[in-house]
């Protein structure tokens, strides 16, 4: 279930929760109601035309029709117009989830609605912290990840991943309560690929910009789990893993640029991600992905870009293990993107193919240089 967009300039009623969708750039709004959870989403309508101008007689009537405070308070209570704080809504949703979960014939659709509402709320930094303080990880996240319903597990993993985005407090709590092992177990054992994909989303939220969690990931056989997934035929999951590994490698490179951050540099060095990747046959997996990106998804330049980016980051370590077919593909891609950069653009960006040409050309030149040095 998606979230309705809000047009700029529209009035925002009290109790309405608004966020910016970082994927689309659209401002979205959501009215969360515990009374009618299945109808929680509402379009915001422009209310400016719903109120006609008041006549002088109406103004006079208004002057003589004031109610005292107690009467107004009573009316507001009857209309349920007292807006609740996000913390109050969070607590009510958590309590409602606990109550439903105890029922023998629990309403799984209602649980999904609660998870969706919670996921919306935890995008806000303070709400995510409150979710942790209210024991949401134990009572909701970890409880649901033991469920048999794949849809509930998917939505719970989305909730988990969203709560950790750029929130170090939640990440620390997730790490201390065993999230790494739980997510790796799902990636290794769950048979539903859509659940695995969501588990990767949550794992990415935990590992990014958190070297201590990255260390726990590699120490707990995380790269072994990844290696098995690279051997599968699911290109979407492989692409997700590739993106995460690229980001983690780039983090390590960036950490060395600030020589004052001695402790941070040491943390990344302790991970030894590059060496561990080689041990877990990452170069072989790159070979396979480079070939598949062209053979299976020949027109998907985004996948090709990620594969080239991964190879660029590991070319010094993987050049000797690249097959002739992979090298020929990189050469062909360089020639292709040279031509495309001269003639075409993507989404109005004339530099897109030029960037891909520069990337593939840098890889070719580096491979040739390494060959000469040997």
Predicted regions and their residues:
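Residues that form ligand- and interface-recognition hot spots within folded domains
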Residues: 135, 221, 230
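Buried hydrophobic core positions in alpha-solenoid tandem helical repeats
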Residues: 93, 97, 139-142, 182-186, ...
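Extended intrinsically disordered, low-complexity coil regions enriched in Ser, Thr, Gly, Ala
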Residues: 132, 272-274, 327-331
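Helix-rich alpha-solenoid scaffolding regions
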Residues: 132-185, 193
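Internal amphipathic alpha-helical repeat/solenoid segments
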Residues: 75-152
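Recurring C-terminal helix/loop segment of individual leucine-rich repeat
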Residues: 129, 172, 212-215, 275
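Alpha-helical solenoid repeats of the armadillo/HEAT superfamily
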Residues: 2, 7-73, 102-119, 148-162, ...
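Short loop-to-helix capping motifs
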Residues: 124-125, 166-167, 210, 317-318
């Amino acid at each position: 279930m998606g979230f309705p967009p809000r047009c700029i300039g529209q009035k925002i009623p009290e109790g309405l929760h608004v966020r910016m969708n970082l994927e689309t750039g659209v401002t979205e709004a959501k009215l969360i109601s515990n009374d009618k959870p299945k109808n929680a989403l509402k379009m915001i309508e422009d209310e400016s035309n719903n109120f006609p101008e008041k006549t002088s007689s109406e103004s006079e009537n208004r002057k003589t029709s004031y109610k005292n405070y107690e009467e107004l308070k009573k009316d507001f209570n009857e209309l349920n117009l007292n807006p609740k704080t996000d913390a109050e809504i969070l607590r009510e949703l958590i309590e409602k989830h606990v109550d439903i979960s105890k029922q023998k014939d629990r309403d799984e659709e209602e649980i999904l609605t609660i998870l969706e509402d919670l996921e919306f709320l935890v995008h806000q930094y303070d709400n995510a912290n409150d979710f942790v303080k209210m024991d949401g990880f134990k009572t909701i996240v970890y409880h649901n990840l033991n469920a048999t319903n794949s849809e509930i597990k998917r939505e719970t993993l989305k909730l988990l991943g969203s709560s950790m985005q750029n929130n170090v407090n939640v990440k620390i709590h997730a790490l201390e309560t065993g999230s790494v092992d739980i997510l790796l177990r799902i990636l290794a054992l769950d048979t539903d690929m859509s659940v695995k994909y969501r588990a990767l989303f949550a794992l990415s939220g935990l590992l990014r910009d958190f070297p201590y969690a990255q260390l726990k990931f590699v120490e707990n056989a995380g790269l072994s789990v990844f290696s098995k997934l690279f051997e599968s035929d699911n290109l979407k999951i492989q692409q997700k893993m590739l993106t995460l590994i690229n980001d983690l490698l780039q983090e390590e490179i960036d950490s060395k640029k600030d020589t004052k951050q001695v402790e941070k540099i040491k943390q990344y060095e302790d991970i030894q991600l590059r060496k561990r990747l080689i041990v877990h046959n990452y170069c072989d997996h790159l070979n396979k992905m480079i070939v598949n990106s062209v053979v299976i998804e020949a027109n998907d330049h985004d996948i090709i870009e990620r594969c080239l980016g991964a190879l660029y980051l590991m070319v010094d370590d993987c050049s000797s293990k690249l097959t002739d077919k992979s090298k020929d593909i990189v050469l062909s891609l360089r020639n292709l993107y040279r031509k495309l950069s001269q003639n075409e653009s993507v989404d109005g960006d004339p530099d897109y193919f030029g960037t891909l040409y520069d990337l593939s050309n840098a890889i070719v030149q580096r491979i040739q240089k390494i060959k000469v040095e040997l």
